[in-house]
Amino acid sequence: MANLEKKRVVVTGLGAITPIGNTLQDYWQGLMEGRNGIGPITRFDASDQACRFGGEVKDFDATQFLDRKEAKRMDRFCHFAVCASQQAINDAKLVINELNADEIGVLIGTGIGGLKVLEDQQTILLDKGPSRCSPFMIPMMIANMASGLTAINLGAKGPNNCTVTACAAGSNAIGDAFRLVQNGYAKAMICGGTEAAITPLSYAGFASARALSFRNDDPLHASRPFDKDRDGFVMGEGSGILILEELESALARGAKIYGEMVGYAMTCDAYHITAPVPDGRGATRAIAWALKDSGLKPEMVSYINAHGTSTPANDVTETRAIKQALGNHAYNIAVSSTKSMTGHLLGGSGGIEAVATVMAIAEDKVPPTINLENPDPECDLDYVPGQSRALIVDVALSNSFGFGGHNVTLAFKKYQ
């Protein structure tokens, strides 16, 4: 039941399946090393595609957490979500049982959902007829199954939902889960984002929209946020999951606490289906409102995990928004884009980037922006170029923006 007294919300578990590592430890180590997860596409024949590279998850085995029969009935985006959620639950040492199952929920966002199964079943429909289509096609395809299957796998019977807000979906899921715990609707939420959109149709569509990088001769340097020579984003895949828990619950069971979530805001540009409003006013409001929600002042911010897609429009617009929201203090903080290493996971990006943001607070280190070799004069902040950095991180923000004009900012701080 809802409680009028707002609860403090802490992060007690993290899980990550990414192009640079399939566990939290490997992912964080990869970020600290500046590991590059981009390479030629191996999941399908991309020889006729305008873009032929991406950030694939490597050496991933869904049967580590799922039996083979279950795994066959799930799309890859659900594999990532269910397995990353199991990692996070294990990390939190949170036992779900008959006594607490109703108080633990799931909220996982995705921008697209099961696109691969849709493509495969469309081919079967055209080649063999409707009677040969799989009875599992619909539950494998629909976006909410990442949350649904995670709940089934873990036995979590509390609030359950799915956000589908393009590239802001993972961050919206975390923010909405934060509100549920903060307002007493759940003791803990398993939340984040997932995506598996490295497919022929996805690449064809994003390439036609001129959103992707076409640097086929040099994929390792294609994702270059805030660099003058950037030419589009690089597709990635994977999932990042957080366990958000009521502080009293976490303390009662002696849980490890990575940090505290303190603010969330979302706005809309109401401007264009794909392009951000050039003056960045929508993103500016999201950043400012998240700080207001948290009760923190701009000068308290140490680090921002930027949306930083490596597209010509986003990086300049986001830089403007950060400066407009934080004033002159924007020049005193570290801002980095981990998409330079992982590529852009679309709806999954908010999940893995929130994980990185929380780890920056816990470890007092910030990830770099790799491939930033020729800075854009309009992008004039400290983007932590090239190498990770030791930095006392007391307050950190994570930005996510999506097609449709969605803007989301999450605010975290050290637990004290």
From Swiss-Prot:
What is this enzyme's EC? 2.3.1.179
Q: GO: which molecular function terms? A: 3-oxoacyl-[acyl-carrier-protein] synthase activity
Query: What are the GO cellular component annotations?
Result: cytosol
Which residue windows are transmembrane per the record?
Answer: none
What's any GO biological process attached to this entry? fatty acid biosynthetic process
The record ties this protein, via InterPro entries, to: 3-oxoacyl-ACP_synth-2 (IPR017568), Beta-ketoacyl_synthase (IPR000794), Ketoacyl_synth_AS (IPR018201), Ketoacyl_synth_C (IPR014031), Ketoacyl_synth_N (IPR014030), PKS_Beta-ketoAc_synthase_dom (IPR020841), Thiolase-like (IPR016039)
Q: Would the keyword Lipid biosynthesis turn up in this protein's UniProt record?
A: yes
SMART domains from the entry?
PKS_KS (SM00825)
Which residue intervals define the domain Ketosynthase family 3 (KS3) in the entry?
6-414
Q: In which pathway does it act?
A: Lipid metabolism; fatty acid biosynthesis
Q: What positions does UniProt annotate as the active site of this protein?
A: C167 (for beta-ketoacyl synthase activity), H307 (for beta-ketoacyl synthase activity), H344 (for beta-ketoacyl synthase activity)
State whether keyword Disulfide bond applies: no
Instruction: Provide this UniProt record's keywords sorted from A to Z.
Output: Acyltransferase, Fatty acid biosynthesis, Fatty acid metabolism, Lipid biosynthesis, Lipid metabolism, Transferase
Which Pfam families did the record assign?
Answer: ketoacyl-synt, Ketoacyl-synt_C
Q: Which cysteines are joined by disulfide bonds?
A: none
**EC top class, in one word?**
transferase
Which reaction does this enzyme catalyse, per its entry? a fatty acyl-[ACP] + malonyl-[ACP] + H(+) = a 3-oxoacyl-[ACP] + holo-[ACP] + CO2; (9Z)-hexadecenoyl-[ACP] + malonyl-[ACP] + H(+) = 3-oxo-(11Z)-octadecenoyl-[ACP] + holo-[ACP] + CO2
Q: What family is it from?
A: Belongs to the thiolase-like superfamily. Beta-ketoacyl-ACP synthases family.
What job does this protein perform? Involved in the type II fatty acid elongation cycle. Catalyzes the elongation of a wide range of acyl-ACP by the addition of two carbons from malonyl-ACP to an acyl acceptor. Can efficiently catalyze the conversion of palmitoleoyl-ACP (cis-hexadec-9-enoyl-ACP) to cis-vaccenoyl-ACP (cis-octadec-11-enoyl-ACP), an essential step in the thermal regulation of fatty acid composition.
Q: How does it assemble?
A: Homodimer.
What name does UniProt use for this protein?
Answer: 3-oxoacyl-[acyl-carrier-protein] synthase 2
Tell me the organism.
Answer: Synechocystis sp. (strain ATCC 27184 / PCC 6803 / Kazusa)
